[in-house]
């Protein structure tokens, strides 16, 4: 039996504040709504036409009154417009009695969570009971292709109707929200998913799925699959019939007996075609394994889409995560939804298989500390909200924590871990930070990449780990594509290095900072250091804890805090990746001390990589638009490969024999392309953008960046050369890093792979004494 709490339509779980005033006590008197058009099985990002009819109720609809159809804020359906009848999104409306109607579409025209709205105002008359207003979304009568649907699946894409029947400017919901079902399109890519580190004999799962072109797992795929493995895998069949109707399949309870690197190639058993290759998984004896989580996202009960149950199911069964948490904005979490989240966390938490941490997002404005993620070890704890902004129940308002320092004070005796993050309201860690509670900085999400959130803490003496998550709003934790609207990046993941997959293991890992983050890929990353003198390894931060203890150590790992007598660290880095490694930066604080590559200058070919990156500023409007062209004078482009071009509707293409045209967006992350030229060129390269032009002779471009700073927040254009075919997917190096005599040395690495993904290790905090 379906739980009614899993249906978002007009749900009492949705944090959606309204007014306590309205024309009558019975909302059915304001009219009713019907929707005609295809309502089921609509393909994501297809063009559709819908006819919505509002029938006026007993109160009539006054002159200058209006109706409003509102949509979810994070839905990326195509923009509605009334100006061009031949273009997408053309929308019309007519009144049955001939009244004049004025249509206005606004991206922020209504209240959260339904910012996007179409308002239809009556002029030159009024409507009586029984009169109608008919709205055609995607009116194709004059050549429009229709209304572009969202890029992601949505079991209930809502047309929420409100009416201002007495022309007060106050809109009241009309009962009976129409909705349509958006489903995945046909498959275009297969994925094979493994974890990254297991011990011999330890069980793991292997996930297989097919996605449509927008990243939705699709049930339209079918194939006879064959698996090729680099190590013998206990429990994995050699062949598998993947049938239609399934959006994924997980092979559980697998194990490998011998040490090595496991990669699994998925082939079409009938044709031999390679469909996918898995992430690498290292099988190694030791005390720990690597478990992957996306701990930050939300669903339609707050600002996202789909339901909380769908969210947890996707994390476990579609993106094959080991761990997750639901992080709704606190000012939208009513008490019924908070209680339901506790139930779901307990239901889905399965030690050893899938770890769920109960939690929420404390969503204070930046001026009072900015966004924080709160994770509890157990269910049933008190939520301390930043405000009750969208909550009508005020009975527990005295439990609020209106700034981040108050939040830390209220949670000081709780068993919690806290992240700071950058979303709509970026965290100000100078305003508030508690090193006992706030263990990590989230430096990548679907909002972009934000190394500065971590590095801001270096001069303040903070010793925080780093994490990456999706902060996804589209119901796809662990595989969160940005779509075609607000978000600019693929969602991140965190690898927790710990001895057991359960809440205790994750909390221990977070408090030791033994984790690393990626921009969405899975790779094995091991970072350690040893020193030319005595080393004292602390069990916790001695600057925060009076009872911190230290013990002699031969070496330390990512996240550790140590006092050393020597002046040099020998940092060892091991990276084993899915795609070839472009570079690894070894850093001390904000300085890059070494750049490691698996190739050298003689290996370079006529392959150039062009990268644009950065943001406008730190806040919500951080999107940087990149429009322009790159011309490779005197050469012919043999082929071009896109990098992080997530929005399929933005231009990135070969526009002539020697030119690439682009229209892109970054939000602190990077995008770009590789180009292979017909010969080793020596002509002039010109990359002209709306933020500046970079000119350089091709012969002067090497494997180091040639860059142009372009204002904004770390905004720049770069070009460098790569080998024609870089095959380095495993890189192990040791390098010496001089230690500063005073203060912390924050030793960490950043790995960049050729497919556009990055990974960062939590810093090792080393001081001399």
What are these regions (language model features)?
Residues 259-262, 275-276, 280-409, 756-765:
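A metal-dependent hydrolase metal-coordination microenvironment
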């Amino acid at each position: 039996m379906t739980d009614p709490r899993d249906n978002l339509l007009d749900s009492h779980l949705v944090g959606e504040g309204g007014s306590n005033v309205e024309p009558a006590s019975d909302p059915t008197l304001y009219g009713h709504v019907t929707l005609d058009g295809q309502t089921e099985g609509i393909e994501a990002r297809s063009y559709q036409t819908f006819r919505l009819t509002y029938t006026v109720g007993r109160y009539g609809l006054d002159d200058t009154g209006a109706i409003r159809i509102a949509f979810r804020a994070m839905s990326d359906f195509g923009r509605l417009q009334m100006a061009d009848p031949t273009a997408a999104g053309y929308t019309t409306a007519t009144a049955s009695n001939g009244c004049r109607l004025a249509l206005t579409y606004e991206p922020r025209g209504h209240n959260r969570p339904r910012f996007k709205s179409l308002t239809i105002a009556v002029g030159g008359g009024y409507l009586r009971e029984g009169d109608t207003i008919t709205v055609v979304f995607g009116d194709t009568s004059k050549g429009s292709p229709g209304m572009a649907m969202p890029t992601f699946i949505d079991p209930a894409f809502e047309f929420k109707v409100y009416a201002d029947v007495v022309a007060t400017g106050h809109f009241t919901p009309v009962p009976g929200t129409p909705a349509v079902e958006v489903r995945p399109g046909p498959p275009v890519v297969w994925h094979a998913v493994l974890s990254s580190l297991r011990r011999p004999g330890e069980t793991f799962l292997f996930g297989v799925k097919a996605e449509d072109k927008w990243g939705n797992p699709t049930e339209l795929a079918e194939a006879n699959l064959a698996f090729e493995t680099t190590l013998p895998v206990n429990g994995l069949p050699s062949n598998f019939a993947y049938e239609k109707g399934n959006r994924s399949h997980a092979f559980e309870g697998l194990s490998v007996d011998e040490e090595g690197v496991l990669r699994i190639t998925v082939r079409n058993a009938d044709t031999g075609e390679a469909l996918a290759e898995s992430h690498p998984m290292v099988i190694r004896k030791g005390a720990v394994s690597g478990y992957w989580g996306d701990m930050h996202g939300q669903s339609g009960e707050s600002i996202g889409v789909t339901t909380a149950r769908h969210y947890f199911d996707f994390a476990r069964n579609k993106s094959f995560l080991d761990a997750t948490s639901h992080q709704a904005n606190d000012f939208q979490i009513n008490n019924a939804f908070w209680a339901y989240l506790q139930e779901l966390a307990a239901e889905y938490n399965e030690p050893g298989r899938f770890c769920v941490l109960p939690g929420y997002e404390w969503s204070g404005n930046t001026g009072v500390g900015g966004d924080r993620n709160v994770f509890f070890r157990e269910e049933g704890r008190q939520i301390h909200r930043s405000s009750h902004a969208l909550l009508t129940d005020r009975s527990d308002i005295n439990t609020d924590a209106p700034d981040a320092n108050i939040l830390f004070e209220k949670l000081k005796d709780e068993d919690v871990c806290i992240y700071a993050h950058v979303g709509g309201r970026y965290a100000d860690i100078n305003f508030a930070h508690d090193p006992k509670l706030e263990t990590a900085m989230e430096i990548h999400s679907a909002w972009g990449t934000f190394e500065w959130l971590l590095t801001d803490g270096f001069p303040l003496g903070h010793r925080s780990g780093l994490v990456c998550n999706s902060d996804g709003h589209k119901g796809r934790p662990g595989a969160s594509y940005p779509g075609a609207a607000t978000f600019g990046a693929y969602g991140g993941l965190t690898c927790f290095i710990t001895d057991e997959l359960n809440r205790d293991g994750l909390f221990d890992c977070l408090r030791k900072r033994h984790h690393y983050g990626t921009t969405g890929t899975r790779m094995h990353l091991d970072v350690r250091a040893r020193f030319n003198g005595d080393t004292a390894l602390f069990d916790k931060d001695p600057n925060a804890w009076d009872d911190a203890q230290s013990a002699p150590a031969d070496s330390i790992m990512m996240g550790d805090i140590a006092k050393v007598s020597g002046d040099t660290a020998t940092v060892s880095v091991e990276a084993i990746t899915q795609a070839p490694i472009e570079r690894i930066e070894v850093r001390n604080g904000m300085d890059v001390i070494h750049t490691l590559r698996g190739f050298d200058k003689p290996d370079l070919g006529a392959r150039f990589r062009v990268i644009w990156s950065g943001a406008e500023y730190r806040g919500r409007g951080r999107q940087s638009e990149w429009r322009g062209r790159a011309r490779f004078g005197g050469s012919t482009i043999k082929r071009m490969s896109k990098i992080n071009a997530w929005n399929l509707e933005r231009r990135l293409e070969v526009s002539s024999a020697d030119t690439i045209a682009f229209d892109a967006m970054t939000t602190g992350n990077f995008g770009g392309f590789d180009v292979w030229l017909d010969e080793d060129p020596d002509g002039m390269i010109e990359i002209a953008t709306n933020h500046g032009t970079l000119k350089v002779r091709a012969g002067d471009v090497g494997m180091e960046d040639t860059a142009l700073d372009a204002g904004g927040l770390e905004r720049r254009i770069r070009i460098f050369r790569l080998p024609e075919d870089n095959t380095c997917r495993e890189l192990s190096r040791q390098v010496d890093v001089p230690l500063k005599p005073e203060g912390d040395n924050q030793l960490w690495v950043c790995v960049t792979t050729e497919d556009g993904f990055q990974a960062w290790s939590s810093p090792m905090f080393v001081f001399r004494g």
